[in-house]
């Protein structure tokens, strides 16, 4: 799902583990995302509720065209959360039920005033 969504390459997959890399990146190069299969996985509850299964990680993807990105994510197999909290963000669920966000923040992130710590 994430390889299709991001246009990245599956650089390794053995059924239990999968590693994605940005196009043209050698295995082990960054950026990359590694996933582990978990047969006992339960999708997190979203929005979060006390004493309920919580997400272990959260991915936000900055995009140029929010509505186009939502349409593409749906095409790849995502679903849109029924509850949304902002016009500039869309909460989506991957096919396993894990939430991720698409956000119209790419111009901010790419500006000279933005820095990651």
Regions found by a protein language model. Give the residues of each.
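Vicinal oxygen chelate
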Residues: 8-58, 70-95, 105-117
């Amino acid at each position: 799902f994430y390889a299709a969504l991001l246009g990245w390459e599956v650089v390794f997959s053995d059924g239990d583990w999968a590693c994605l890399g940005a196009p043209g990146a050698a295995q082990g190069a960054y950026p990359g995302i590694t996933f582990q299969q978990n047969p006992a996985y339960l999708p997190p509850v979203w929005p979060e509720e006390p004493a309920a299964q919580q997400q272990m990680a959260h991915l936000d993807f900055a995009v140029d065209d929010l509505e186009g990105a939502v349409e593409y994510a749906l095409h790849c197999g995502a679903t849109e959360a029924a509850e949304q909290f902002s016009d500039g963000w869309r909460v989506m669920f991957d096919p396993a039920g894990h939430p991720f966000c698409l956000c119209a923040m790419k111009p901010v992130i790419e500006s000279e005033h933005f820095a990651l710590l």
